[in-house]
Amino acid sequence: MLTTLPQKAEPAHTALILVDVLNAFCAEGGAMHREGRDLSLVEPMMPRLHKLIQAARAAKIKLVWIQCAYNTGPNHYLSEVWLEQAKRRRNGAYTDFPVCEPGKWDQDFYEVRPLPDEVIVT
């Protein structure tokens, strides 16, 4: 059992989890931008994220990439309950256009890219 901080922080027992660094959520023209969300914090964050990824790879820390895959088209993966909540809380923004459709630009990673041996969770 890992009991000390140095043991727990050892690269063999550590992972950097990158969640939703996707065009949909970070890029001009992505779903959040089209919805009118403020993306002003994304650009200042990206150089830091690049450095963090580079340092994690250099330290042999496992990188795990989370990549959403869903849409709101006729074959959507979102539950009816979720869509109803989106309509009530966000004026239906998610029901007006697809978000993170598999294989589309919106679902692609934004200014970062997993290496072939890194884990992608979709």
What is the predicted function of each stretch?
Residues M1-L115:
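Active-site acidic carboxylates
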